[in-house]
């Protein structure tokens, strides 16, 4: 295997598992089981080390387990201390390059769990003064994985990592919301035409439009934050299927307590370990919340592309910052590339949500072996959403400018002004005016005076666009 970030001396050590022996480069902290996983799974080419939060969470879980096993007299204190120190190094970002298995893997996450077990065991052996591969001093299964199964250690680490990742996602979202609020305030005095079904509707301000985007996204911070709490319930101590085989009766509570201290999260034991080991409901809920955010971001970006269309034959109400030439054949063309890329991220997130749904449905009996693809999709979606929102905020929203005269001219030329006459002239008369304006090209203002339906003074008050962007009492009342 060629991991270019790990320099090799050519020296090797020999390791074995139930399938036989294998030569392992001396610089690798992972061992034979990880090597077999690397050989088997050339799938996504996205390794565990692409998501540092997952490595950090695996270290949390292994440290909590070691502390609980030590306290219960199941693990030699010296070995426990070495494991704890190795985990602390992982949490500090060391040895990330050693987490090399593909995120998409068979085995319900066993390859991920063993990658962590082997790296921690080999580093712990070094801290104890021994060489990598001398498993009698610290064994990946007998010591690092003591009282655990992949089926409780892996999903617990995933949940912890997802909480931290969602916190970053929400922070990025809040910054984007603030950017929309800032533009809403900046554009608060700019009158423009609102549209429904892409047809002229009634006046509004450009600021109201951007404030609506901010409000729309604010709902998602609340939903993501509430949804995140589902991940506080963990199944450490469930071991293989939730019955707790090979775990001390006090292990689950003690390990969960230590994990609360290590992570600072309000983690709790699942009330039914068998249900918690097989259930993926929290993943479905979180994926759905990510999809909902993606859909809203995509809709907003659709609007930005429409509002900036032109510059001479489109709406041209706003200008997006020009970021790169838009065409290899059309000189001078600049495209809305940033909203476009956010659209594409949204499509990917929506697709990932479908994958999570199908993989969750595919669970059988006491375990869902499809969790690796669920985990891959969730972390990929979060990563892409964070990057997309940061890019949109920094390179697009912050630099948007308004074409105020274009916006105002469209309002005064619009037949949509006639809506304001409904309370005074009635729907049928207003409809007649709209039809005549469309046929003759005359303005609504001129036609009302021509037909002597209202005085000029009263008409001016009614059709003043600034008076049409908020609820107000009928003039004269």
Name each model feature, range by range:
Residues 1-477:
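Conserved, well-structured ligand/cofactor-binding cores
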């Amino acid at each position: 295997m060629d991991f270019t970030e790990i320099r090799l001396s050519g020296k090797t050590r020999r390791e074995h598992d139930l399938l036989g022996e294998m030569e392992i480069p001396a610089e690798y902290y992972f061992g034979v089981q990880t090597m077999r996983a690397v050989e088997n799974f050339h799938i996504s080419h996205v390794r565990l080390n692409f998501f540092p939060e997952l490595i950090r969470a695996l270290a949390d879980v292994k440290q909590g387990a070691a502390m609980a096993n030590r306290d219960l007299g199941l693990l030699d204190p010296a070995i426990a201390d070495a494991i704890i120190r190795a985990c602390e190094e992982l949490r500090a970002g060391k040895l990330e390059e050693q987490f090399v298995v593909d995120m998409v893997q068979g085995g319900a996450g066993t390859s991920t769990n063993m990658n962590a077990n082997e790296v921690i065991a080999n580093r712990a052996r070094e801290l104890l003064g021994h060489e990598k591969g001398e498993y009698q001093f610290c064994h990946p299964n007998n010591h690092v994985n003591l009282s655990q199964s992949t089926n409780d250690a892996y999903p617990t680490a995933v949940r912890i990592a997802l909480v931290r990742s969602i916190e970053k996602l929400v922070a990025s979202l809040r910054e984007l919301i603030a950017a929309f609020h800032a533009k809403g305030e900046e554009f608060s005095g700019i009158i423009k035409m609102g549209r429904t079904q892409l047809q002229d509707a009634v006046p509004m301000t450009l600021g109201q439009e951007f404030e609506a985007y901010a409000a729309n996204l604010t709902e998602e911070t609340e939903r993501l934050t509430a949804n995140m709490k589902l991940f506080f319930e963990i199944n450490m101590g469930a071991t293989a299927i939730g019955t707790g085989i090979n775990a001390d009766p006090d292990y689950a509570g003690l390990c969960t307590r230590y994990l609360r201290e290590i992570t600072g999260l309000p983690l709790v034991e699942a009330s039914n370990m068998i249900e918690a080991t097989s259930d993926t409901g929290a993943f479905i809920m979180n994926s759905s919340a990510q999809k909902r955010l993606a859909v809203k971001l995509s809709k907003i970006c659709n609007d930005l592309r429409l509002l900036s269309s032109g510059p001479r034959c489109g709406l041209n109400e706003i200008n997006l910052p020009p970021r790169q030439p838009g065409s290899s054949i059309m000189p001078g063309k600049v495209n809305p590339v940033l909203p476009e890329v956010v659209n594409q991220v949204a499509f990917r997130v929506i697709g990932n949500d479908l994958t999570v749904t199908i993989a969750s449905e595919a669970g059988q009996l006491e375990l869902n072996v499809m969790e690796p693809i669920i985990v891959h999709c969730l972390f990929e979606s979060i990563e892409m959403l964070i990057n997309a929102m940061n890019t949109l905020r920094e390179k697009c929203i912050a630099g948007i400018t308004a074409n105020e005269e274009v916006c105002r001219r469209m309002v005064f030329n619009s037949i949509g002004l006639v809506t304001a006459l409904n309370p005074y002239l009635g729907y049928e008369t207003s409809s007649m005016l709209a039809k005549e304006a469309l046929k003759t090209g005359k303005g609504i203002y001129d036609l009302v005076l021509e037909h002597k339906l209202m005085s000029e003074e009263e008409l001016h008050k009614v059709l003043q666009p600034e008076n049409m962007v908020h609820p107000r009492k009928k003039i004269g009342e």
